[in-house]
Regions:
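N-terminal glycine-rich phosphate/pyrophosphate-binding loop and immediately adjacent elements
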Residues: 1-111, 115, 120-131, 234, ...
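Glycine-rich loop(s) and the adjacent beta-strand/alpha-helix scaffold that form part
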Residues: 21-24, 28, 35-47, 209, ...
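Mid-to-C-terminal "cap/lid" subdomains and adjacent gly/pro-rich loops that border
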Residues: 36, 68-69, 266, 270-386, ...
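Conserved redox-cofactor binding core of oxidoreductases
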Residues: 55, 59, 70-77, 98, ...
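Surface-exposed patches in mature extracellular/periplasmic domains of secreted proteins
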Residues: 140-148, 182-184, 451-454, 585-593, ...
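A glycine-rich dinucleotide-binding beta-alpha-beta segment and adjacent secondary-structure elements
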Residues: 181-203, 210, 237-241, 385-396, ...
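N-terminal leader/targeting peptides and immediately adjacent processing regions
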Residues: 543-586
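Mature-region segments of soluble proteins
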Residues: 553-560, 573-576, 588-591, 595-606, ...
Length: 686
């Protein structure tokens, strides 16, 4: 067994940035990643099934996705679900790429608002690291945003903001509210060996072009060529420590289920704000009975998830193809990102504008029910490409009751306790969500929306705060450089170390902190104590919970084709229902005319094998019933099946113009029309 200079657990954003810095310094690096590589051709991309797959095996929720590499997350005691991705690239594979830095005051919440704590570092100390990771990820945007100190200038020009972005920008110029062309980790032109964005609108299910800055593309391929050893299918069970209390490596299980051990002088955790506390708590020893690095009792506590609200505005007269813009953000607003006591709550939210999605989302908007029968075609045509969507990212404060613990009833497929999330939105958060929803409605009405609708977000992937940094070991888990107070050669570089959440998407800050921590370790490596690898390893603590009920995630592969059980009677019944739900119009065919009860429902079920049993059961228990005679659940299942199959029809796609291939690359706005129109003048003049 070879001892690595550094062992990194997790191959997402923070692990990649840290690995690059260690490799640049000539250190030997081993990375253990429990997922696998995903080839770009496996992503849904421009396939008509993309929206369906995003709700199934390409969901950002591990509990829905259920891949063999995933670990389940118990969120039954949480107001929000938790999103992640297990594989090379981590969450960057499925994130939308909106790339914002935290604001200077986000690091000084105690000083500014008298709540939570200040960070043990400032924006100024992080700025050079922000700049460096912007270059690594290929960030596009427009410099000069007055909400930031000078120097926050992206290395590539901004992506187009489109007709919808321009409408809302004009409204904010008239209202006197801040707006700015969005900053995204998405390339507008060929660079860094990557192709430019082609505006597929499917960033959230993997970028087929490599334009989005996911670390499987931006970092890991190059790092492997340079000698970094990246082991996939490696599920880490425990961080090992020696008798002196120093980290000496990790125990892990390979693809076959065999136990392995990797020794290292330094261990770096890059497992996200749920995975890292889970691993620390599972690594309890007799010397660390409450979990590794947990003498403060803070491991897993103060979880922050960025509760999100959404507001849709429906407009008239825009092009149906407008929904296909990149999914990062078109524009963003920080008008209300700071605190104002007159609002009745502390802290604020950042707004990010995008389109409201494709035909399936249009069909079921605004309430998850949609419109059916003769009204269906007008309903979809009035929304597809004609809706703008404000995502309101609210800052939640760190609260001890919001936490991650080890489940006593749920394990992953190797028997390791799952993470159990306890999270409740506070009164402050609820007031913030309601207030920002009203302001976002005002914004879209000012932009000319003929209808505005509030949307609930049930989950988020911004996982922060569960191993917070600080200078006092009694009140923090790691020091300002990410080194654990209790285990000085154990370093945490993911969102766990956040002291407060800010309201910016956290990936930029996570990456900058990871680079800062890795750079500090490289510069001071001689001062880092090392374990005596010839000595004995501390045994696990016997009180580490072992769940009584083992639950294994479903295994999903892109090639899996379910066995269908639709009889001819089932298909006849579905055909009758289909033409009631989506009849013909002067411009659109009926569902039955394009093959919904035949080959299209087969394509639908191939994309969503998890829905086969429910559809078969519903068809058989409603046989002979008209739609109006069915219960709500039956109507829901059948509407989804009919619409899901209908919008897979190439003829329907052609008539609605929601899939016009081939797509040309975007043309970056080197001198955008909104500059010529003066839409930024009031922002810059304030």
């Amino acid at each position: 067994m070879t001892t690595a200079d550094v062992l990194i657990v997790g191959a997402g954003a923070s692990g990649a940035v840290a690995a690059r810095r260690f490799s640049d310094a000539g250190m030997s690096v081993v990375v253990l990643e429990q997922g696998d590589w995903t080839a770009p051709h496996q992503y849904p991309g421009s396939a008509l099934e993309a929206e369906l797959l995003a709700g199934g095996r390409w969901s950002a929720s591990p509990n829905v996705r259920g891949w063999a590499a995933d670990y389940p997350i118990d969120t039954t005691r949480s107001d929000l679900g938790a999103l992640n991705f297990n594989g090379v690239g981590g969450a960057t594979v499925l994130y939308n790429g909106h790339w914002l830095r935290m604001l200077p005051d986000d690091f000084r919440v105690r000083t500014v608002d008298g709540v939570a704590d200040d960070w043990p570092l400032t924006y100024a100390e992080l700025q050079t690291f922000y700049d460096a990771v912007d270059r690594q990820f290929g960030v596009s945007g427009l410099g000069g945003n007055p909400r930031y100190p000078p120097g926050a200038d992206p290395p590539f020009p901004p992506l187009p903001i489109g007709a919808l972005g321009t409408r809302v920008a004009r409204a904010h110029a008239e209202l006197g509210w801040h707006w700015w062309p969005a900053t995204n980790a998405i390339l507008p032109a060929t660079a860094c060996g990557r192709r430019p964005c082609i505006q597929q609108g499917t960033c959230g299910t993997g970028c087929t072009e490599g334009a989005k800055g996911s670390t499987d593309v931006t970092h890991w391929r190059d790092l492997v060529r340079r000698g970094v050893r990246l082991v996939t299918g490696a599920r880490v069970q425990r961080i090992a420590v020696d008798r002196a209390g120093l980290a000496c490596g990790a125990e892990w299980v390979d693809h076959s289920g065999a136990g392995q051990f990797q020794a290292a002088d330094v261990v770096v955790l890059a497992c996200n704000g749920i995975g890292t506390p889970r691993l620390l708590l599972a690594s309890a020893t007799t010397a660390h009975p409450d979990g590794l690095a947990n003498s403060s009792g803070l491991v897993g506590t103060r979880l922050m998830l960025h509760p999100i609200a959404g507001v849709t505005g429906v407009f008239e007269g825009t092009d149906a193809g407008a929904w296909r813009a990149h999914n990062g953000a078109l524009i963003h607003s920080m008008e209300f990102a700071g605190s104002d006591a007159s609002r009745g709550f502390l802290r604020g939210a950042t707004w990010a504008l995008g389109s409201a999605g494709g035909p399936l989302r249009a069909a079921f908007a605004p309430d998850g029910v949609g419109a059916w029968g003769l009204a269906h075609h007008g309903h979809v045509a009035g929304r597809l490409g004609r809706t703008a969507y404000w995502t309101l990212i609210c800052e939640d404060l760190p609260e001890a009751a919001n936490r991650v613990v080890l489940s006593r009833t749920l394990v992953d497929s190797n028997g390791m306790p799952a993470a159990e999330v306890h999270y409740r939105r506070s009164a402050n958060t609820e007031a913030m969500l309601a207030w920002h929803t009203e302001r976002a409605m005002e914004s879209l009405r000012a932009a000319g929306a003929v209808a505005v609708e509030a949307v609930t977000h049930p989950a988020n992937g911004h996982l922060m705060g569960t191993a917070r940094m600080g200078v006092d070991p009694a009140r923090s888990v790691v020091d300002p450089w990410g080194r654990c107070h209790d285990v000085p050669n154990l370093v945490i570089v993911d969102g766990s170390v956040f002291v407060t959440a800010g309201s910016a998407n956290p990936t930029s800050t996570i990456a900058a902190l990871a680079l800062r921590a890795a750079d500090h370790l490289v510069r001071h490596r001689r001062d880092v104590p090392r374990a005596a690898h010839h000595g004995s390893v501390m045994p696990p603590h016997r009180r580490t919970p072992r769940p009584a009920v083992q639950t294994t995630p479903r295994t999903t592969t892109a090639a899996a084709v379910p066995t269908f059980h639709l009889t001819e009677a089932d298909r006849r019944h579905l055909g009758r229902i289909a033409d009631m739900l989506i009849p013909a119009s002067p411009t659109m065919p009926a569902a039955g005319d394009v093959g919904v009860p035949g080959h299209l429902v087969d394509r639908y079920l191939a994309a969503r094998p998890d829905l086969v049993a429910g559809l078969v059961d519903t068809l058989r228990r409603t046989a002979g019933q008209a739609v109006e005679q069915m219960d709500d659940e039956a109507r829901r299942v059948l509407r989804h099946a009919v619409a899901g199959a209908y919008y897979l029809s190439p003829e329907v796609a052609r008539r609605l113009r929601y899939r016009a291939d081939p797509l040309p690359p975007v043309r970056p706005d080197t001198y955008p029309a909104y500059v010529a129109e003066g839409l930024l003048d009031q922002v810059l003049a304030r």
